[in-house]
């Protein structure tokens, strides 16, 4: 199976395992009642899905019933008929993001960062600190929603990885690798506190998460970089492009 197909199967399987997921026609909706951010709530089409307009109307209605933006994340090659149907129904492409992956023999060690300590959160206070770094790192204000820390806890207890980076006891970075499926895990939610960026913390934290996942018998770590600069950081520790993911949504009515 090509790597991009593996990645799509991994994402779809995790969505189906999530306790609050919805099935709407040929779609699985990953719904997070405790985390309203759009990146935590999206639909994935079935392999080779060919949705009707009625299927799409039902999908939109399900999102709006749960007070979420109608949105999908998927690799277009897994269901070629879906993107044209979505565009015809008024959806707008947010972006086409590269999908990158790394195998154990490709991982490179980045330069060390002075005084940086990376460890897995163990206490509620540590998970909350990690979630706060992520929340602010992705532009949030105030306190994070409960779902942010919950995602890290689920990863840490389900065979994935969670990590909190500190410098002299101050939380400066956080991220995780999802619960694995058939040896694949997604590195996600990686964030570095604004005052500590451009010091190599992102690369160090990413390499730590990836190496730890390999140590827990994962065979591939994949991710979606946020922009070209972030992609270069991941490329510097051994990640390479394996496909492209479509992020597409319907503007509020």
Would you name each region that the model predicts?
Residues 79-93, 203, 227-244:
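Conserved active-site alpha-helix within GNAT-family acetyltransferase domains
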Residues 143-193:
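A conserved beta-strand-loop-helix scaffold within acyl/acetyltransferase catalytic domains
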Residues 1-67, 78-79, 83:
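N-terminal charged segments
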Residues 1-10, 43-44, 48-50, 97-98, ...:
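Short amphipathic alpha-helix that is part of the acyltransferase structural core
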Residues 66-75, 213-226:
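Conserved GNAT acetyl-CoA-binding A-motif
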